[in-house]
Structures are given as C-alpha cells and as structure tokens.
C-alpha cells in the first residue's frame, strides 16, 4: 500500500523539496517529481542546480531510462515505482503504484483547497496518511 505524507504550512515549496530530496537520495531512493508542465520542470531543475553549494542532487527532466535518481515530469510517467512528490493540484491516476507519495502544501488558500480535496480522496480510499506541519519542524 502507498504511504502518503502531507507537508502543510510550507513557506517555500522549493526549499522543502530540496530538504526532502537530500534525505531520500541518501537512502538511495528513486524519486519522481510531478510538476504542471515543462516550464515548471525547468524551473525546478534550475533550482536544484543552484540551491546548495555543498550538495548536488542528480536529476533529469523526463522519463528516460537514465540512471539519475530524480526524474522531473508532468505526464506522470516514471521509470520507478519507489517515491513520488506531487506538485500538481490534481491526483495522479497512478499514485497507488508508488511505495510513498508526498504532497507539499503551501500557505496559499487555493493550494490548501486543492490539497484538502486530494486528502479527502486518499482518506476515502483508506490510505494511511501522515500530516506534517512544516511550520513546527526544526
């Protein structure tokens, strides 16, 4: 069964993604990040290249069979079933194939509303969900 984490009250989604990726890469995870479109993928890729001068997060845009542990895409096609970070407002039709799904929710009211809809969808289907208040993390 897919384990789902909802990070809410996130001030900066990009920083939270970077934080999560650094932990999960260390654990040898294969990660798919779902974004809205190519522009979103390129913006995230650029951020990952410049976010830290002390670490590098190997990634690529698209779903090629390359060995990069992080793939960024917008069509929900992934080369791995290990781990997904959903940055889209809709629900992936294939979310249940992943061992773990992370939803990141900002303080934006529209983002909160669509996140509540996704949360209800997952709960109604019996998924175990962990709610993590990012404003209380150290």
What function would you assign to each model-found segment?
Residues 1-13:
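Glycine-rich phosphate-binding "P-loop"
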Residues 5-8, 30-35, 84-85, 103-104:
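Short hydrophobic beta-strand segments
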Residues 100, 105-111, 115:
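Trafficking entry modules
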């Amino acid at each position: 069964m897919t384990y789902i984490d909802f990070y809410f009250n996130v001030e900066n989604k990009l920083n939270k993604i970077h934080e999560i990726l650094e932990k999960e890469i260390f654990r040898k995870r294969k990660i798919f990040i779902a974004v809205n479109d190519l522009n979103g993928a390129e913006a995230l890729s650029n951020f990952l290249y410049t976010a830290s001068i002390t670490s590098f997060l190997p990634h690529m845009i698209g779903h090629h069979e390359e060995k990069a542990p992080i793939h960024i895409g917008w069509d929900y096609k992934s080369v791995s079933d290990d781990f997904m970070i959903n940055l889209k407002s809709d629900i992936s039709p294939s979310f249940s194939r992943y061992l773990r799904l992370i939803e990141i929710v900002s303080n934006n009211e529209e983002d909160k509303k669509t996140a509540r809809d996704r949360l209800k969808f997952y709960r109604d289907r019996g998924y175990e969900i962990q709610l993590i208040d990012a404003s209380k993390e150290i």
